[in-house]
A protein has these predicted regions:
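A structural motif at transmembrane helix-loop-helix junctions in multipass membrane proteins
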Residues: 120-152, 202-203
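Hydrophobic alpha-helical transmembrane segments in multi-pass integral membrane proteins
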Residues: 155-169
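Short, hydrophobic transmembrane alpha-helix segments
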Residues: 21-33
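Hydrophobic alpha-helical transmembrane segments that constitute the membrane-spanning cores
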Residues: 80-106, 125
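Junction motif at the cytosolic side of a transmembrane helix
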Residues: 186-203
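Helix-loop-helix units of permease transmembrane domains in multi-pass membrane transporters
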Residues: 55-86
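Aromatic- and glycine-rich beta-strand/loop motifs that create alpha-glucan
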Residues: 1-11
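Long, hydrophobic alpha-helical segments
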Residues: 21, 36-53
Length: 203
């Protein structure tokens, strides 16, 4: 657990460093908040993909998958719980590091709570989509691993609506409905596809 938390800390240190480089490079230019938000979300996407990839590589090797298959719990349930734990871990670290990111990118702190809620809702979908990517890319077949890129377009709606939500009032609850609905959509098929890939492609 300590090792996994240290991995998350390293990922968010990367986000802070990358944000600092972006902020320093454009310190004499008036930056629109949408640009700063885009930078944060792209870095968050990268952090999620790397984090989920490492967790699935370590926690779903051949021997552990065999143990999970003989467990009283369905593999889909195990995948769901694992993904929720990853979400909570990432959301907590984002909450802790976001004040520094806000300062670096000169974002308005009046949106601090709303953006953290937005990030948490985004993380739910990002992690569940990334679990499909990770389960395929960790397969023994390099040919099948290449097909994991087909899940990448699923990330695009989150980026579009995250930036688009700035045009709406972040205090308006309706601006978060898409993220909740998109998570429910991913929840319907992600654990099934992930568990299928783990069972079939890793053997």
């Amino acid at each position: 657990m300590l090792l996994k938390n240290s991995q998350t800390l390293i990922l968010f240190s990367f986000i802070i460093i990358a944000s600092s480089i972006f902020g320093l490079a454009l310190r004499y230019i008036q930056i629109d908040s949408k640009i700063s938000m885009t930078v944060i979300w792209i870095l968050l996407f990268l952090a999620v993909i790397i984090k989920v990839e490492k967790v699935y590589l370590e926690d779903f090797d051949d021997s552990k998958i065999q143990q999970y298959l003989t467990s009283v719990f369905a593999l889909e349930i195990i995948v769901f719980v694992k993904n929720i734990m990853i979400c909570l871990n990432l959301a907590l670290f984002f909450l802790l590091t976001s004040p520094l990111i806000f300062l670096i990118l000169s974002l308005n702190f009046k949106y601090f709570l709303q953006i953290n809620i937005l990030a948490s809702l985004s993380l739910l979908s990002l992690v569940f989509i990334s679990s499909i990517t990770a389960s395929i890319s960790n397969s023994k077949s390099n040919r099948l691993a290449i097909t994991s890129v087909v899940t990448l377009p699923l990330f695009i709606p989150i980026l579009i609506f995250s930036i688009g939500s700035l045009d709406m009032s972040l205090g308006d609850k309706n601006s978060y409905l898409f993220f909740f609905a998109y998570f429910l959509l991913n929840l319907a098929f992600s654990p099934l596809l992930t568990s299928f890939a783990l069972k079939k492609l890793s053997m």
